[in-house]
Amino acid sequence: MEPALAEEWLEWMNEVHIPQVMATGCFREVGILKVLTNAADDEGVNYSIQYRAQSLADYERYRDQFAPALQQETKARYGEQILAFRTLLEEIRPLSPLVH
């Protein structure tokens, strides 16, 4: 997204969108990461919002019952100003401190 939009978008995500997603009960954790490495031609600001579900069934329930309306709300608010895509990941090994 354009840098001028980033602060407002992040505030909206924290105050509106993420609470709506978490209120579905489909996820147990959420994290926001700022992407520091961008493609050479990308001068925008990029974030990764990561939701963690207890099970694949919880994710599928979110995808089928809640995601369409929430995605439409985001599109109505921001239109083509942001690019959003979803990637489903399976955790193989959780983050943990390095043990010597």
PLM feature segments, named:
Residues 6-8, 58-60, 95-96:
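Intrinsically disordered, low-complexity acidic/polar segments
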Residues 23-26, 54, 94-98:
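A short, structured loop/turn motif at beta-sheet edges
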Residues 31-42, 73-100:
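Glycine-rich beta-strand-turn "strand-cap" elements at beta-sheet edges
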Residues 20, 59-75, 99-100:
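Hydrophobic transmembrane alpha-helix bundles
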Residues 5-32, 69-72:
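Short amphipathic alpha-helical segments
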Residues 33-65:
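Short, well-ordered beta-strand segments in beta-rich or mixed alpha/beta enzyme
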